[in-house]
Amino acid sequence: MTKSAELFAKAQDKIPGGVNSPVRAFAGVGGSPIFVERADGPLIFDADGKAYIDYVGSWGPMILGHNHAAIREAVISAAQRGLSFGAPTETEITMAELVSELVPSMEQVRMVSSGTEATMSAIRLARGYTGRDKIMKFEGCYHGHADSLLVKAGSGALTLGQPSSPGVPADFAKYTLTATFNDLDSVRELFAVNKGEIACIIVEPVAGNMNCIPPVEGFHEGLRQICDEEGALLIFDEVMTGFRVAENCAQGYYNIKPDLTTLGKVIGGGMPVGAFGGRKEVMQYIAPTGPVYQAGTLSGNPVAMAAGFACLKVLTEEGNEKRLADTTRHLANGFKELANKHGIPMVVNQVGGMFGFFFTDQETVTSYADVAKCDIERFKRFFHLMLKKGVYLAPSAFEASFTSLAHGPKEIEATLEAADQCFAIIASEAK
């Protein structure tokens, strides 16, 4: 038995399921999860000392790679001045200014401590601003574990085979309308039936919680137009895509201006940080300037702000956005070419520094219904074969994978060499 397996067995005695976030338990792929001891650059090292090329990146935040010197030094410096004050700091201002500079639609920014907190707060704000109760989301999209957002959710909810969660009262769920991702007709139909009742549409601009699904042409433009016509707010949940798809986020990449934006993951550089922001007119409805209440003991934590600021400054240095996208594109194209070589039908999607692959005969994968048709068992087999060869992909067919600026030609070629061997095994097993 490996040390990771021993630790997993031990953890289950005191921690529900042995983990503190469900997808980490390998429920979507089977077997025991690896327990990580340390990480550096593009690599993680498990409790047995084995190294893996990491394409999970702490589920997105580690865009510079693990243990980056600039972030580490910023954290140490900030920690030496105190861990938390419960009072405003200048660092919060500089961080908000940088975010607004990079994401112009975020004229004002409120810092929080997680992506879930950001989306939950943004929706409360949208409801308060519009005076409407209903919200619209998309099947398979995940926006955190707030009650109203776990209706037909993606991510861990899909991995566990639960498109919605027990414990969410029916009275909450009835205010959440679910449309089909990449299908504007389904959006229009819901607005027609709920005229004047919908406060907002919340959407992942690239759906990353049912693997990786980009928008079809015209989808986001259509959402913007519909929201304008119906008096609803458009919320881009950029917790995953923020600063990863492009330095101006997915909204910059697709040239769409949402009313509100939520951020997380990359914005903290590995520390627990979230944020939401948007038009000043809307943000002024948040307390203390407005009636919509939102607060947090650790919001704007000085150590977390220092980490996030350092991360964004390095990330936005000239050439880094292109290098990250080029690296990810090379890897994604390599997966597709190797799958074709071995006669394995596969769809590979990639945007910026995120990618996903689907074992399927379909020509495209554009919605949750398409994802549900994919060969999950083949994904599980491929995941474990790659893991044995020292490549750590997202342990769920419903999760996107990520590269970092620390991933170089050496890591990409090693990954593709491993994939070539794993595809060969899978192809031979199918004969």
Curated annotation (Swiss-Prot):
Q: Which UniProt keywords apply?
A: Cytoplasm, Isomerase, Porphyrin biosynthesis, Pyridoxal phosphate
Any one GO CC term of this protein is:
cytoplasm
In the UniProt record, does the keyword Cytoplasm occur? yes
So what does this thing catalyse? (S)-4-amino-5-oxopentanoate = 5-aminolevulinate
Which biological pathway? Porphyrin-containing compound metabolism; protoporphyrin-IX biosynthesis; 5-aminolevulinate from L-glutamyl-tRNA(Glu): step 2/2
Please state where this protein is localized.
Cytoplasm
Q: In the record, which positions carry N6-(pyridoxal phosphate)lysine?
A: 265
What's a Pfam family in this record?
Aminotran_3
Any one GO BP annotation for this protein? protoporphyrinogen IX biosynthetic process
UniProt keyword Transport present: no
List the GO molecular function terms. Answer: glutamate-1-semialdehyde 2,1-aminomutase activity; pyridoxal phosphate binding; transaminase activity
Q: Which domain of life is it from?
A: Bacteria
Q: Which cofactor does it need?
A: pyridoxal 5'-phosphate
Write down the NCBIfam families for this protein, in alphabetical order: hemL, PRK00062.1
Per the record, the similarity remark reads: Belongs to the class-III pyridoxal-phosphate-dependent aminotransferase family. HemL subfamily.
Full protein name = Glutamate-1-semialdehyde 2,1-aminomutase
